[in-house]
């Protein structure tokens, strides 16, 4: 069967299942099953060629059925891109989002602007390790301390540390993972008053705002989604309190939050003891993260 027919049929199946980007998802899954790049699929489509062995096409159809049931694309392929990393993901770990790349960039820009050498960085609510592993691989000499509450999720963090260290061997001794409650004052207490920057993407979804997308609602771990209160700010506020003790004078907290929470969290940060606090925007112009100076 020509690849054009394969993609057309697959796109139709995904479209009927309510997938927003059926053709893209079909092409990406075929590339994954056939062990080629997405551009190879596009080229085969352009040239009207065949692609994939019988066995590979069987794998593709199985992946397609999973996607039609609204399983996240990244869980099916087993990995998710984040900045310069390709992170392993699967059921039980939060899939890193593009908007979090903006949060990381804000932190890295601050480190660069202030000429930080060998900065001490903390990633609270580490999940897949996206934030901390990005920092430790992009900022030479940085020491990153990551905290994750779930032992199961921490296994994904360790996997991604192992994979990232293959590309950046020096980071193995610069990344430290603790399985603990990120909001507890006992967690990383030995670092209190010494941290240059805390970059974090805590659970913040309001309990009144259950996600409509099945990929999020039915698959992302609830522990990584909901902020512990009706408006979703309970856990973010506890993270602010913890970060305030961790940071040295002049240190910075960069924390992702819901688009509805900016003003409240800025006010809370100032009331907690931060000298300055403001809201940063993501690439769509929406209020997306707190930037607070100790």
From Swiss-Prot:
<dbReference type="GO" id="GO:0102559">
    <property type="term" value="F:protein-(glutamine-N5) methyltransferase activity"/>
</dbReference>
<dbReference type="InterPro" id="IPR040758">
    <property type="entry name" value="PrmC_N"/>
</dbReference>
<keyword id="KW-0949">S-adenosyl-L-methionine</keyword>
<keyword id="KW-0489">Methyltransferase</keyword>
<dbReference type="InterPro" id="IPR019874">
    <property type="entry name" value="RF_methyltr_PrmC"/>
</dbReference>
<dbReference type="Pfam" id="PF03602">
    <property type="entry name" value="Cons_hypoth95"/>
</dbReference>
<dbReference type="InterPro" id="IPR029063">
    <property type="entry name" value="SAM-dependent_MTases_sf"/>
</dbReference>
<dbReference type="GO" id="GO:0003676">
    <property type="term" value="F:nucleic acid binding"/>
</dbReference>
<protein>
    <recommendedName>
        <fullName>Release factor glutamine methyltransferase</fullName>
        <ecNumber>2.1.1.297</ecNumber>
    </recommendedName>
</protein>
<dbReference type="InterPro" id="IPR004556">
    <property type="entry name" value="HemK-like"/>
</dbReference>
<dbReference type="InterPro" id="IPR002052">
    <property type="entry name" value="DNA_methylase_N6_adenine_CS"/>
</dbReference>
<dbReference type="GO" id="GO:0032259">
    <property type="term" value="P:methylation"/>
</dbReference>
<dbReference type="Pfam" id="PF17827">
    <property type="entry name" value="PrmC_N"/>
</dbReference>
<comment type="similarity">
    <text>Belongs to the protein N5-glutamine methyltransferase family. PrmC subfamily.</text>
</comment>
<dbReference type="InterPro" id="IPR050320">
    <property type="entry name" value="N5-glutamine_MTase"/>
</dbReference>
<comment type="function">
    <text>Methylates the class 1 translation termination release factors RF1/PrfA and RF2/PrfB on the glutamine residue of the universally conserved GGQ motif.</text>
</comment>
<feature type="binding site">
    <location>
        <begin position="201"/>
        <end position="204"/>
    </location>
    <ligand>
        <name>substrate</name>
    </ligand>
</feature>
<keyword id="KW-0808">Transferase</keyword>
<feature type="binding site">
    <location>
        <position position="148"/>
    </location>
    <ligand>
        <name>S-adenosyl-L-methionine</name>
    </ligand>
</feature>
<dbReference type="GO" id="GO:0036009">
    <property type="term" value="F:protein-glutamine N-methyltransferase activity"/>
</dbReference>
<feature type="binding site">
    <location>
        <position position="201"/>
    </location>
    <ligand>
        <name>S-adenosyl-L-methionine</name>
    </ligand>
</feature>
């Amino acid at each position: 069967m020509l690849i054009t027919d394969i993609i057309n049929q697959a796109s139709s199946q995904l479209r009927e299942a309510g997938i927003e980007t059926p053709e893209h998802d079909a092409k990406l899954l075929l590339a994954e099953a056939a062990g080629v790049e997405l551009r190879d699929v596009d080229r085969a489509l352009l040239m009207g060629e065949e692609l994939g062995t019988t066995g590979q096409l069987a794998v593709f159809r199985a992946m397609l059925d999973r996607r039609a049931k609204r399983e996240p694309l990244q869980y099916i392929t087993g990995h998710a891109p984040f900045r310069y990393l390709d992170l392993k993901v699967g059921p039980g770990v939060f899939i890193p989002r593009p908007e979090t790349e903006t949060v990381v960039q804000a932190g890295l820009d601050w480190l660069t602007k202030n000429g930080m050498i060998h900065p001490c960085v903390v990633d609270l609510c580490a999940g897949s390790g996206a934030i901390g592993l990005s920092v430790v691989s992009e900022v030479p000499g940085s020491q990153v301390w990551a905290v994750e509450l779930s032992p199961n999720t921490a296994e994904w963090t360790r996997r991604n540390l192992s994979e990232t260290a293959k590309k950046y061997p020096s980071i193995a001794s610069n990344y430290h993972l603790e399985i603990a409650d990120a909001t507890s004052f006992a967690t990383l207490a030995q670092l209190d008053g010494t941290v240059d920057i805390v970059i974090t993407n805590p659970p913040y979804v309001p309990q009144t705002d259950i996600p409509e997308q099945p990929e999020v609602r039915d698959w992302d771990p609830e522990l990584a989604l909901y902020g512990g209160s009706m408006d979703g700010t309970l856990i973010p506020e506890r993270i602010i309190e913890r970060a305030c003790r961790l940071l040295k004078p002049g240190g910075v907290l960069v924390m992702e939050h819901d688009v509805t929470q900016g003003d409240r969290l800025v006010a809370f940060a100032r009331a907690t003891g931060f000298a300055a606090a403001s809201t940063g925007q993501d690439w769509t112009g929406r209020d997306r993260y707190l930037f607070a100076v100790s």
